[in-house]
Regions:
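Residue-level signal for discrete positions within transmembrane alpha-helices
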Residues: 27, 31, 116-117, 121, ...
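A late C-terminal transmembrane helix in Major Facilitator Superfamily
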Residues: 85, 99-137, 141-144
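Short amphipathic helix-loop junctions that connect adjacent transmembrane helices
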Residues: 1-16
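Helix-loop junctions at the membrane-solvent interface of multi-pass transporters
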Residues: 59-67, 84, 134, 151, ...
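Multi-pass alpha-helical transporter architecture, strongest
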Residues: 142-170
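Small-residue-mediated transmembrane helix hinge/kink sites in multi-pass secondary transporters
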Residues: 3, 35-42, 94, 124-132, ...
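Transmembrane helix-loop junctions in multipass membrane proteins, especially transporters and channels
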Residues: 69-73, 132, 136, 160-167
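C-terminal transmembrane helical hairpin of 12-TM major facilitator-type secondary transporters
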Residues: 13, 18-30, 34-99, 103, ...
Length: 170
């Protein structure tokens, strides 16, 4: 986020703290979002909340990050994205327990994390390839947001196999 801020806001002194402020704000709101996610999961269900987080994160990347070109909008994007889109690790064990039960939960959670590790390892590199190939952070936002939306859609089959009612707390 600091590199993006430096590119989008060349008027900021790169040796000052200013380009890092969006990262600091986003990390602060990530903590708030993870705590908040527990309350949301209690109210609406962990699987529904996990879907919402992924979906909101994808939409924020596609609609907001792709157009965040001012210092204020970059800070706002970072804050909103982490507040709403960063619930994965907080909700993963809770959602896994809802889907598979608590027996062997540590193993199940480990397999889920291992299953998403290729994306974690390759995601930043692929974003770099997109950035190098296009020279546009907007294209990176489209790529990243699209993958996050696709990830949110991958949650739906498991959710609806467990409970078909749309408004069910699951």
């Amino acid at each position: 986020m600091t590199a993006y801020t430096t590119v989008q806001c060349p008027e900021l002194d790169p040796d000052s703290l200013a380009p890092s402020i969006p990262l600091i704000v986003s990390n602060f709101t990530l903590g708030i979002g993870r705590v908040f996610s527990g309350f949301i999961a209690d109210a609406f269900g962990p699987i529904n909340s996990l879907f919402f987080s992924f979906f909101a994160g994808g939409i924020l990347q596609l609609a907001f990050w792709s157009n965040a070109t001012t210092y204020g909008s970059i800070i706002a994007f970072g804050a909103l994205y982490q507040l709403l889109g960063g619930w994965f690790f907080a909700l993963l064990p809770y959602a896994a327990a809802q889907l598979f039960g608590t027996r062997g939960l540590a193993t199940i959670t480990g397999y889920i994390i291992a299953g998403q590790s290729p994306g974690q390892f390759a995601g930043a590199s692929l974003s770099g390839v997109v950035l190098d190939g296009t020279g546009s952070y907007q294209k990176v936002a489209y790529y990243s947001g699209s993958l996050m939306l696709a990830g949110s859609l991958c949650i739906l089959p498991a959710r609806f196999l467990r409970e078909k009612r749309i408004l069910a707390r699951l």
